[in-house]
Amino acid sequence: FFYGCTNKSSYSNSDDAYINYATDMQLMYHIGGNAPMTKSDKGYYYIGEDGIVIFIDKETKKATPLCSKPNCTHDDPEACDAYLNLTQKPDTLVGAHDSAIQYNDGYLYALCGEYDKSYINYNTYLMRMKPDGNQRENLTGSFNFYAFEWFIHRGYFYCSTDSSVIRIPLDSPKSEPQILYKTDYY
């Protein structure tokens, strides 16, 4: 074998060679299937205790709840903007929540959920909001499946269900999911 040095300009460079944190899945922040932290151009966001979103400013390194209310004590989910109604995981103890958040193309995304008025049916959906925590919206409507693991990558929401891997385009989030893989054994 022969080894040598070369300058970087001689390498072939493709769009797929590097991760763009603004549009690609941020694999480096996934821990055991969850992604409790995500990077943006201004800093980092993470899911803290009880589903509260914390922003860490890149310049000042100051961590603050993502809440717009100046005198908020951040201890009441009904009153504090920093709380997310994160989806409950069906395969864990009651009350365990998905703790994933992802920054992608100028927005923050999280899986959220809520019971209907009868408290029988649990509705899960993909929530999108601006990086300042405002303009929250239910992007997909209620899923008719449970999303076990999920991420956003290059314009698509990908997730695994109990029997398949699907994707939904973010530019048409209420469209029928495209099945990428389906098992016959579940």
Put a short name on every predicted segment.
Residues 2-4:
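C-terminal motif of bacterial Sec signal peptides marking the signal peptidase cleavage site
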Residues 7-64:
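An edge-strand/N-cap motif at the start of beta-rich repeat modules
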Residues 27-40, 75-103, 143-154, 182-186:
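Repeated scaffold domains used in trafficking and secretory/extracellular systems
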Residues 45-47, 109-112, 158-160:
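Residue position within the beta-strands of beta-propeller blades
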Residues 50-52, 114-120, 164:
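Short glycine/acidic-enriched loop and turn motifs that connect beta-strands
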Residues 52-54, 65, 125-127, 164-166:
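A short loop-to-beta-strand structural motif that recurs across blades of beta-propeller domains
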Residues 57-61, 130-134, 169-174:
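Short loop/turn segments that connect beta-strands within beta-propeller blades
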Residues 63-79, 137-143, 176-184:
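Beta-propeller fold detector
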